[in-house]
């Protein structure tokens, strides 16, 4: 087995071991009623969900941008050894990857500005509006984070191909750049959907 297969096997075994231990503990101490999704959703604070949305928006976007820059940058450096002329104009691909992280920062700021304090502590007093706001912020953060993650990988792979194609044939650069622009639009779609998800959100007393 390779190291990666051992890692996946270890994660799989650890996950199911934790599930078995939790199940046994809930059975022994008669806490099976707590193994309930509705109980979990109503007993957690809407602030937790909104902050999770903020964290996912920025962290997944940064991972996508870093991954794309890594893929593109390694190809630019490698191709630049044989064709030094590609180093400057292929930095456009790096800028496209960096824009993915900027999308995440913008959405994280938008979500954080919507989170308002409220005084209630009981689930009934918190109200449906605050729960809806927390879940919507979480969903928006997850939407923009995942879309930017895959957008960064997409732009990185296309940018890598653009750099290597440009090193071989300079006339191919503009054609592949158009493909890269369409790939970068994926992240923008995620931002638009996330803004729509949080457009009617109101949190507070």
UniProtKB/Swiss-Prot annotation:
InterPro entries xrefs: ATPase_proteolipid_c-like_dom, ATPase_proteolipid_csu, F/V-ATP_Csub_sf
Keywords recorded for this protein, A-Z: Cytoplasmic vesicle, Hydrogen ion transport, Ion transport, Membrane, Transmembrane, Transmembrane helix, Transport
Quaternary structure note: V-ATPase is a heteromultimeric enzyme made up of two complexes: the ATP-hydrolytic V1 complex and the proton translocation V0 complex. The V1 complex consists of three catalytic AB heterodimers that form a heterohexamer, three peripheral stalks each consisting of EG heterodimers, one central rotor including subunits D and F, and the regulatory subunits C and H. The proton translocation complex V0 consists of the proton transport subunit a, a ring of proteolipid subunits c9c'', rotary subunit d, subunits e and f, and the accessory subunits ATP6AP1/Ac45 and ATP6AP2/PRR. Interacts with IFITM3.
Functional description taken from the UniProt entry: Proton-conducting pore forming subunit of the V0 complex of vacuolar(H+)-ATPase (V-ATPase), a multisubunit enzyme composed of a peripheral complex (V1) that hydrolyzes ATP and a membrane integral complex (V0) that translocates protons. V-ATPase is responsible for acidifying and maintaining the pH of intracellular compartments and in some cell types, is targeted to the plasma membrane, where it is responsible for acidifying the extracellular environment.
Cited PANTHER family: V-TYPE PROTON ATPASE PROTEOLIPID SUBUNIT (PTHR10263)
Compartments reported by the entry: Cytoplasmic vesicle, Clathrin-coated vesicle membrane
Lumenal side: 1-3, 73-90, 159-175
UniProt similarity note: Belongs to the V-ATPase proteolipid subunit family.
Cytoplasmic topological domain: 25-51, 112-137, 197-205
UniProt key word Manganese: no
Protein name, entry field: V-type proton ATPase 21 kDa proteolipid subunit c''
CC annotations in GO: clathrin-coated vesicle membrane; endosome; membrane; proton-transporting V-type ATPase complex; proton-transporting V-type ATPase, V0 domain; vacuolar proton-transporting V-type ATPase complex; vacuolar proton-transporting V-type ATPase, V0 domain
Record membrane topology: Multi-pass membrane protein
Keyword Nucleus included in the entry's annotation: no
MF GO annotations: P-type proton-exporting transporter activity; proton-transporting ATPase activity, rotational mechanism
Transmembrane portions of the chain: 4-24, 52-72, 91-111, 138-158, 176-196
Main localization (coarse): membrane
């Amino acid at each position: 087995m390779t190291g990666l297969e051992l890692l996946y096997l270890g994660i799989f075994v650890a996950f199911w071991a934790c599930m078995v231990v939790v199940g046994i503990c809930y059975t022994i101490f008669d806490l099976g009623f707590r193994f309930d999704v509705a109980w979990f959703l109503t007993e957690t604070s809407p602030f937790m969900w909104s902050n999770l949305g903020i964290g996912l928006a920025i962290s997944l976007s940064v991972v996508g941008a870093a991954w794309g820059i890594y893929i593109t940058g390694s190809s630019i450096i490698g191709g630049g050894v044989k064709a030094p002329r590609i180093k400057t104009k292929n930095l456009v691909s790096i800028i496209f990857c960096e824009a993915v992280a900027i999308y995440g920062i913008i959405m994280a700021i938008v979500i954080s500005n919507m989170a308002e304090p409220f005084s209630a502590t009981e689930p009934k007093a918190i109200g449906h509006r605050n729960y809806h706001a927390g879940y919507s912020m979480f969903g928006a953060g997850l939407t923009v984070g995942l879309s930017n993650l895959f957008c960064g990988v997409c732009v990185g792979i296309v940018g890598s191909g653009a750099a290597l194609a440009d090193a071989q044939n300079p006339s191919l650069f503009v054609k592949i750049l158009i493909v890269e622009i369409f790939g970068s639009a994926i992240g923008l779609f995620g931002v638009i959907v996330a803004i729509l998800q949080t457009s009617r959100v109101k949190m507070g007393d």
